[in-house]
A protein has these predicted regions:
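A structural signal for well-ordered alpha-helical scaffolds and beta->alpha junctions
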Residues: 60, 92-95, 128, 178-182, ...
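Conserved alpha-helical substructure of the radical SAM core
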Residues: 18-146, 153-156, 318-324
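Accessory C-terminal segments flanking Radical SAM cores
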Residues: 216-324
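Flexible, charged surface loops at secondary-structure boundaries
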Residues: 107-110, 164-166, 290
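Conserved AdoMet/S-adenosylmethionine-binding subsite of the radical SAM
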Residues: 125-243, 247-252, 257
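Boundary detector for helix-to-coil junctions that initiate low-complexity/charged tails
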Residues: 1-17, 21
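A broadly conserved sequence feature marking short terminus-proximal activation segments
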Residues: 16-47, 200, 245-271
Length: 324
C-alpha cells in the first residue's frame, strides 16, 4: 500500500526539488555544512521539508506489520512494492516470535501510536483473526489498527468481526476510486462495535484527482542521506517490523523485493535497523528513528513527482531512477 503524502507540497506534475535542509539547525540529525540561502524557491521547499520533519519527530510513530505480501489492487508506485512481490502470508508462529521479543522492550506499548496490520491487503490473510489475537495477547494495551483498501470488508466472516471487536481493533480504510461504498463500510464496521475511519494511503489534489507520489530510488546510492532523511515524509513515522528487526520506514525495509524482481543490489547496513533482541527500552527506538540511515542514500527525493492513481505496469521505472 502506498502511504499518504504529508511532506513538502507538490504542485502540478512537476518534480519536487528538495535541496539541502537547514543544515545549521539539524546537526543533531546528522546533517553537516553551512546554512542555505533564504531567498529562493529551493530554500522555501527546504524550509517546508524541515518544518514537516520537526512535526513528524513530535508525533508518535506507528509500527507497521506486513501480514500479506500481495494485494487485490495493483497500484502504480506502491511503496510496499506489492505489485511485484511474490504472493505470501506472514505465518502466525513467525509473528509470535517477533511479538514475544517486542513485548520485552520497556515502554514499547506506550511508544507506538498503533500496531498496524497491513500489506499488501491484510484481509487476504486466512488467519487474520488469529493474528489479531496474538497482537493483543503480547501487547495488551497497544492500539491495533487494521489498514485496508476495504474491498473484502463487506464479505468479512463473523469470526473476523468478533475478533476485531474483542481485541478493540480500529480499522483504517483507504478510499481508492473503485466505486465502493466506503461510507457504507464505515457504517458496517460501526455496526459491529468497531471504530473505523477513512484515510491513509491515497492523496487527493485540489481538483479532486487521486494521486500518489512517485519516490524513485537510486540503486547507486549517490544521494545525500541527511537530505533524504529530512525530506522524507515517512522516515521515523511509519516504522516497519520485519524478520526480527525494526526499520525506520516501509520502503527501506522491503528493498529486497526490488532485488528479487529486478536484480538490483540494494543492501542493508547494520545501522539501518534495530535487532529486536538487542532493544532494552523505547528510548533506544526513539534515538534510532531520529537519525539518518545508510540506506537513505538510495532515496532520490529531489526527483519526487506526483502521478495520478492507476494500475501498475510492474516496470522498474515505477521505482528506480534511470529506468524507462
Amino acid at each position: 500500500m502506498a502511504q499518504q503524502t504529508r511532506g513538502p507540497q507538490v504542485t502540478g506534475g512537476e518534480p519536487v526539488v528538495v535541496t539541502s535542509p537547514w543544515r545549521s539547525l539539524v546537526l543533531s540529525y546528522g546533517a553537516e555544512g553551512e546554512a542555505p540561502e533564504s531567498d529562493s524557491s529551493k530554500a522555501l521547499e527546504r524550509d517546508r521539508a524541515f518544518a514537516h520533519h520537526m512535526r513528524r519527530m513530535f508525533q508518535r510513530p506507528t509500527l507497521d506489520v506486513d501480514i500479506v505480501n500481495h494485494c487485490n489492487l495493483n497500484c502504480a508506485c506502491c511503496c510496499h512494492y506489492s505489485p511485484i512481490a511474490d504472493p505470501g502470508f506472514l505465518a502466525p508462529e513467525d509473528l509470535e516470535q517477533d511479538l514475544a521479543l517486542l513485548a520485552q522492550i520497556e515502554g514499547v506499548e506506550e511508544f507506538f501510536d498503533a500496531i498496524c496490520l497491513m500489506g499488501g491487503e491484510p484481509l487476504l490473510h486466512p488467519q487474520l483473526p488469529e493474528i489479531a489475537w496474538l497482537v493483543r495477547r503480547y501487547l495488551p494495551s497497544a492500539i491495533i489498527r487494521l489498514v485496508t483498501n476495504g474491498i473484502l470488508l463487506g464479505d468479512a466472516s463473523a469470526e473476523l468481526w468478533e475478533a476485531l471487536h474483542e481485541v478493540g481493533a480500529q480499522i483504517l480504510i483507504t478510499p481508492y476510486p473503485t466505486g465502493i461504498d466506503y461510507v457504507g463500510l464505515v457504517e458496517l464496521a460501526t455496526s459491529h462495535g468497531i471504530d473505523a475511519v477513512l484515510g491513509g494511503g491515497l492523496a487527493v489534489s485540489d481538483e479532486g484527482e487521486a494521486f500518489f507520489l512517485k519516490n524513485p530510488l537510486d540503486e547507486r546510492g549517490e544521494q545525500d542521506p541527511a537530505e533524504s532523511f529530512i525530506a522524507c515524509p515517512l522516515a521515523g513515522s511509519t516504522m516497519q517490523l520485519l524478520d526480527h528487526r525494526i526499520y525506520p520506514c516501509n520502503g527501506g525495509a522491503l528493498l529486497g523485493r526490488l532485488n528479487e524482481r529486478f536484480g538490483t543490489a540494494f543492501r542493508h547496513e547494520p545501522d539501518d535497523y534495530l535487532e529486536l533482541a538487542s532493544i532494552r527500552n523505547a528510548d533506544e527506538i526513539e534515538t534510532f528513528r531520529r537519525t539518518k540511515k545508510p540506506m537513505c542514500r538510495y532515496c532520490a527525493h529531489g526527483l519526487v513527482e506526483r502521478i495520478a492513481w492507476g494500475p501498475s505496469s510492474r516496470s522498474a521505472s515505477e521505482w528506480l531512477v534511470g529506468c524507462s
